[in-house]
């Protein structure tokens, strides 16, 4: 569903309003005062979040974010505040960054927070967008789209609810019994709610959802408001780990370094184990890689997850850069050329159907594509203005530098064996010496996961990839990434990368002349006439072995403890190795998957709101493959 931005409008007295819904965004007596009286105080805050590890708020109707800014402001002012504040909010018609700035200027006391929000305001694409603010301690998860479709897909465990859509008379869908029933499913134990609405239908629907509601004095001349508390223990995600926040991460490539960084951001101590002498020396060691999504006409799972992964990855890269860490990357843009006229027509239809924001994706005809590439091209294609090239080794290193007091690296130590005990997991080296122990272990060791007996159920295959390097003259094109059944990237330190080959179950570590020729042929297909000027005597390159999955999606989650399961078995009922997780199967899209996969896994382990819709989380579950073979269940020996 395309996202149509809200249109900025005001009533005669200057109150922000929606012409589409015929209602105002806040009480005429003051939006900030209403947020503090109805929603913050109405949910017993700040007292209820004090002393907590994390606290989650779910809001229906983000509007222009005034409730969020007021809550963030109250959290900052509270010396007893929780360690991490999660604020999850759904909005069908979000404002543009420019209109947000116009609206937020009315409250100068919130200016620093509003500016930080504006700096990180996401591209207006459908689905979930996770933003880390206030040095990562305030996490805003925005759901852009229809709440009736999105809330049933959310996994949250909310401690408080802000019900702040337009009035039931103007926007009845947001107050329907079916939608309010989802709040009961999403409620954590002891969850509260507050809303300015005292509609009888709303209160009856909330009661049916498990909330005991009461009327209370209202705000701005409104006689009453509604407060409630959930009667039963909620079914949101619970912490999956032991009280000791300590994890082993096996592997220091994109998967492992990203996971270590996301756990450390939550205050976890992490031991990273890798046989190499430093981070990013295996499949994550290429000179440059590409960060961009893969749209589809039907917006399938791959399209949705690559969109979420690319946008979250960009957010993560910007935060590392803002922190002064030496990650090398450039959002120069990615040009994805059509393979042929049929594919070109399909690319046009994708853009016409989904109407994405122009700062995310647009179709460019041949002449504009040629201008962007700096080279005459035979076809047009997709242009991703925010697409980027990234140096994977620098990203791995930057991830591990974020929390030097919490991340300890054991380089040059190959894990030979992983053993479970009553206290968790211990990794041993080839001499039988313990490297480190922790209650939680994460397998992020690429194709090495195939040698771990506990992960025998995971169908990870090795895909050999060869990238070609050649000297690039200063100022030579292209200065953007160009893809067409291969890719060529801007030069880094005078060297340009082109590739890559993809050969499954091929263990040859040396460069092959035939693969160099294949990559030059791909380069010629991308930029006709370009390869002729490449000095073949100066060719170099690199070989890596990428962990691939059968369905081109990564594996993120707890490792199954059985080799097969009945197809009717729900994923949640498949036996797992307690405290053992995998981040695997990245294939050729490691940069797209890594940051989001790590955030998903860390959120699951910590019992926090998840950053992806439930069906997409299930699509990444390592146990999904067990439901595809023959019937029956066999436990590992």
Curated annotation (Swiss-Prot):
<protein>
    <recommendedName>
        <fullName>tRNA 5-methylaminomethyl-2-thiouridine biosynthesis bifunctional protein MnmC</fullName>
        <ecNumber>2.1.1.61</ecNumber>
        <ecNumber>1.5.-.-</ecNumber>
    </recommendedName>
</protein>
<keyword id="KW-0949">S-adenosyl-L-methionine</keyword>
<dbReference type="GO" id="GO:0050660">
    <property type="term" value="F:flavin adenine dinucleotide binding"/>
</dbReference>
<keyword id="KW-0274">FAD</keyword>
<keyword id="KW-0511">Multifunctional enzyme</keyword>
<dbReference type="InterPro" id="IPR036188">
    <property type="entry name" value="FAD/NAD-bd_sf"/>
</dbReference>
<comment type="similarity">
    <text>In the C-terminal section; belongs to the DAO family.</text>
</comment>
<feature type="region of interest" description="tRNA (mnm(5)s(2)U34)-methyltransferase">
    <location>
        <begin position="1"/>
        <end position="231"/>
    </location>
</feature>
<dbReference type="InterPro" id="IPR029063">
    <property type="entry name" value="SAM-dependent_MTases_sf"/>
</dbReference>
<dbReference type="Pfam" id="PF01266">
    <property type="entry name" value="DAO"/>
</dbReference>
<dbReference type="InterPro" id="IPR008471">
    <property type="entry name" value="MnmC-like_methylTransf"/>
</dbReference>
<dbReference type="InterPro" id="IPR047785">
    <property type="entry name" value="tRNA_MNMC2"/>
</dbReference>
<dbReference type="Pfam" id="PF05430">
    <property type="entry name" value="Methyltransf_30"/>
</dbReference>
<feature type="region of interest" description="FAD-dependent cmnm(5)s(2)U34 oxidoreductase">
    <location>
        <begin position="250"/>
        <end position="637"/>
    </location>
</feature>
<keyword id="KW-0489">Methyltransferase</keyword>
<keyword id="KW-0808">Transferase</keyword>
<dbReference type="GO" id="GO:0002098">
    <property type="term" value="P:tRNA wobble uridine modification"/>
</dbReference>
<dbReference type="InterPro" id="IPR006076">
    <property type="entry name" value="FAD-dep_OxRdtase"/>
</dbReference>
<dbReference type="GO" id="GO:0032259">
    <property type="term" value="P:methylation"/>
</dbReference>
<keyword id="KW-0819">tRNA processing</keyword>
<dbReference type="GO" id="GO:0016645">
    <property type="term" value="F:oxidoreductase activity, acting on the CH-NH group of donors"/>
</dbReference>
<dbReference type="GO" id="GO:0005737">
    <property type="term" value="C:cytoplasm"/>
</dbReference>
<keyword id="KW-0560">Oxidoreductase</keyword>
<keyword id="KW-0963">Cytoplasm</keyword>
<dbReference type="InterPro" id="IPR017610">
    <property type="entry name" value="tRNA_S-uridine_synth_MnmC_C"/>
</dbReference>
<comment type="similarity">
    <text>In the N-terminal section; belongs to the methyltransferase superfamily. tRNA (mnm(5)s(2)U34)-methyltransferase family.</text>
</comment>
<comment type="function">
    <text>Catalyzes the last two steps in the biosynthesis of 5-methylaminomethyl-2-thiouridine (mnm(5)s(2)U) at the wobble position (U34) in tRNA. Catalyzes the FAD-dependent demodification of cmnm(5)s(2)U34 to nm(5)s(2)U34, followed by the transfer of a methyl group from S-adenosyl-L-methionine to nm(5)s(2)U34, to form mnm(5)s(2)U34.</text>
</comment>
<dbReference type="InterPro" id="IPR023032">
    <property type="entry name" value="tRNA_MAMT_biosynth_bifunc_MnmC"/>
</dbReference>
<keyword id="KW-0285">Flavoprotein</keyword>
<dbReference type="GO" id="GO:0004808">
    <property type="term" value="F:tRNA (5-methylaminomethyl-2-thiouridylate)(34)-methyltransferase activity"/>
</dbReference>
